[in-house]
């Protein structure tokens, strides 16, 4: 695949800036690495926030919009966003009805979102609930399903929770439908080659075809 990068170290920031310039009717970037809805509803509704490392487009920023997510915090490629950035994403999504945090089952994301949730609860009195996406059946056995990663299946959670929030449902109602969706979603992915990190410039691993 051909790709054009100005400087690999600027890949994430330039990608997000380009996204907002190309679709300024949908996206807004109030600060670096934070994408929110450009035209939020005036009515009070439950906010929905996600976040994670870059390199998985259109996740996460591509699902910010009406009936979907209200904000997404973005880290470096394959790296969790900071807890401070996640807290700012929660604040940006808050409409006074609480905020659902819906993201993948990764250690760094869990740690930072937990800290962000505690911060906004203490400093801003924002109530948050959390639903983890654990749809990737290739990453753990059924007996250890709680260890499974969240990948493409979380998109269904974004849509179901986002639609419920848009209807004016409570935080508990939005959380329940997101949890039910994730509990009933399974995915598996495959790739023909290993990935290439922009800052490295070559494949992370080389595999011999069987």
Regions found by a protein language model. Give the residues of each.
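N-terminal amphipathic/basic leader segments beginning at the initiator methionine
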Residues: 1-48, 202-204
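Short glycine-rich or small-residue beta-strand-to-loop segments that form or flank ligand, phosphate
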Residues: 2, 46-53, 69-72, 98-107, ...
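Generic secondary-structure signature for well-ordered alpha-helical cores
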Residues: 17-28, 69, 73-74, 91, ...
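Glycine-rich, flexible N-terminal cofactor/catalytic loop recognition
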Residues: 32-66, 73
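Glycine-rich oxoanion-binding loops at beta->alpha junctions
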Residues: 56, 65-96
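Short Gly/Thr/Asp-enriched flexible loops that form oxyanion-binding sites at enzyme active sites
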Residues: 110-124, 144
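Short alpha-helices
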Residues: 131-184
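Conserved small/polar residues in nucleotide/adenosyl-binding loops
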Residues: 205-210
């Amino acid at each position: 695949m051909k790709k054009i990068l100005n400087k690999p170290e600027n890949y994430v920031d330039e990608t997000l800036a380009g996204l907002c310039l190309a679709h300024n009717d949908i996206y807004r970037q109030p600060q670096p690495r934070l994408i929110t809805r450009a035209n939020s509803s005036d009515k009070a509704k439950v906010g929905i926030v996600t976040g994670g490392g870059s390199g998985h487009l259109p996740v996460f920023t591509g699902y910010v919009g009406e009936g979907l997510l209200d904000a997404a915090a973005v880290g470096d490629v394959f790296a969790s966003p900071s807890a401070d950035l996640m807290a700012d994403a929660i604040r940006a999504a808050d409409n006074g009805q609480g905020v659902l945090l819906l993201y993948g089952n990764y250690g760094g994301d869990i740690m930072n979102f937990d800290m962000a949730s505690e911060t906004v609860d203490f400093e801003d009195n924002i109530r948050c609930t959390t639903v983890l996406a654990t749809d990737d059946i290739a990453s753990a056995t059924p007996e250890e399903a709680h260890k499974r990663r969240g990948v493409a299946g979380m998109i269904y959670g974004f849509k179901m929770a986002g639609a419920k929030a848009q209807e004016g449902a409570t935080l508990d109602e939005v959380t329940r439908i997101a949890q039910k969706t994730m509990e009933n979603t399974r995915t598996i992915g495959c790739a023909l080659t290993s990935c290439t990190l922009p800052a490295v410039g070559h494949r992370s691993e080389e595999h011999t075809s069987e």
